[in-house]
Each structure stands twice: as structure tokens, then as C-alpha cells.
Amino acid sequence: MPKIKTSGVKYPDGWELIEPTLSELHSKMREAENDPHDGRRKCEALWPIFKINHQRSRYLYDLYYNRKEISQELYEFCLDQGHADRNLIAKWKKQGYERLCCLRCIQTRDHNFATTCVCRVPKHLREEQVIECVHCGCKGCASGD
């Protein structure tokens, strides 16, 4: 007789500790994706999605690297299941990118003159006015702020 594969995923130890927060962030993400963007600019419609993605990734990053409350197995499981952005977390581990808001802000192909986003400029080098990033709505994610 052939083996029957079940669709159930085996969750590592400690999953029950982080599952409520991740499910809450997942439901917020669904609301943000289905939210109508009437009266807003096209780019502003994606800002809540970028913000929630940042929150999910930062939550798992803090649990594993800063507070050391989850195991490596659980951390890798969450990354493999798509609960956090693996590339964004990889950037956070590098010096100068500890507070990076999203990956689009450091891609030079999306900006004029092949530079990074305006939110990557430290506050002491900016003018008096408050500037929001066009991609994600960030007001400043430079490490020196």
C-alpha cells in the first residue's frame, strides 16, 4: 500500500509561545491587503503592508538574536514558512543596517542618481522638514539616528 502524505506541518517546540502574535500579525496583514485605497496615492496603499512585514520580521529577530527566547530550529522553521523576511533580517545583522525599514530603500536601481532612499539619510544631515519615504512611508531608518 502506498504511503499517504498528510498536509499537517509538525511545529517545533516553542511554537505555542509565538503563534498568537504571529497569527495576529497575519490577520493584520490580510486586513491591510484587502483595505481599499480610495483617496490615497498608489504608493501609500502599500505602506501598511511594508510596516507589518517589518513588525513580523523584527519580532522574530528580537526573539532569536536579542532575547534568545526561541530555538534555532523554531527560528529557521518560521523563516522557511514565510513568517519573516529572511533577506531583511540578514541586512539587520550588518553594521549600518540595524534599523533598516525595508529592502527597497537600499536598492539603487529604484532611485534617481543610483543612490539610496531619503529615509537612509541621518537626521542631523537633513533639512528641518520631515520627509517620508515614497516606498514604505518610513521617516528615518539610518543607524545614526
From Swiss-Prot:
Pfam family, one: BUD31
BP term (GO), one: mRNA splicing, via spliceosome
Subcellular location as annotated: Nucleus
An example Gene Ontology CC term for this record: spliceosomal complex
Keywords from the named record: Nucleus
Principal subcellular localization: nucleus
Family to which the UniProt record says this protein belongs: Belongs to the BUD31 (G10) family.
Name of the molecule in the record: Protein BUD31 homolog 3
Source organism of this protein record: Oryza sativa subsp. japonica (Rice)
